[in-house]
From Swiss-Prot:
Residues with PTM N6-butyryllysine: K10, K19, K24
The name this protein goes by in its record: Histone H3.2
Organism from which the protein derives: Homo sapiens (Human)
Gene designation: H3C15
Residue numbers carrying N6-lactoyllysine: K10, K15, K19, K24, K28, K57, K80
Modified residues (N6,N6-dimethyllysine): K5, K10, K28, K37, K80
Residues bearing the modification N6-(2-hydroxyisobutyryl)lysine: K5, K10, K15, K19, K24, K28, K37, K57, K65, K80, K123
Residue numbers carrying N6-succinyllysine: K15, K57, K80, K123
Sites of S-palmitoyl cysteine lipidation: C111
Allysine modification, residue list: K5
PTM remark: Acetylation is generally linked to gene activation. Acetylation on Lys-10 (H3K9ac) impairs methylation at Arg-9 (H3R8me2s). Acetylation on Lys-19 (H3K18ac) and Lys-24 (H3K24ac) favors methylation at Arg-18 (H3R17me). Acetylation at Lys-123 (H3K122ac) by EP300/p300 plays a central role in chromatin structure: localizes at the surface of the histone octamer and stimulates transcription, possibly by promoting nucleosome instability.
N6-decanoyllysine lipid sites: K19
Annotated keywords: Acetylation, ADP-ribosylation, Chromosome, Citrullination, DNA-binding, Hydroxylation, Lipoprotein, Methylation, Nucleosome core, Nucleus, Palmitate, Phosphoprotein, Ubl conjugation
Amino acid sequence: MARTKQTARKSTGGKAPRKQLATKAARKSAPATGGVKKPHRYRPGTVALREIRRYQKSTELLIRKLPFQRLVREIAQDFKTDLRFQSSAVMALQEASEAYLVGLFEDTNLCAIHAKRVTIMPKDIQLARRIRGERA
């Protein structure tokens, strides 16, 4: 076989074998059955899908009532001081707010899917609102 000329190559710097730590060596020598059992973990996305199905089945309000009521009162302060609210009025506002947010997230998800993504981003919300005509 004919000899070929060797060209110089840059070394990639192979790693030298390191000494094992005492804990690693002890772990390897210990029997596998005597170890602590790992807690069960679902695959990524499984719990998310379960939560989606659960919340789509349910009809209860998802935002806590008192924090929402405080937010409504805080926003109302900017328009008129000493406003009073019937409890049914706050409930109606909360129903409408949650319905709006659910619809917005549905449209946002469609925008993310259109961009060949599964993760929603702020730009998806902005696009959904722009298409709806809520913000120019």
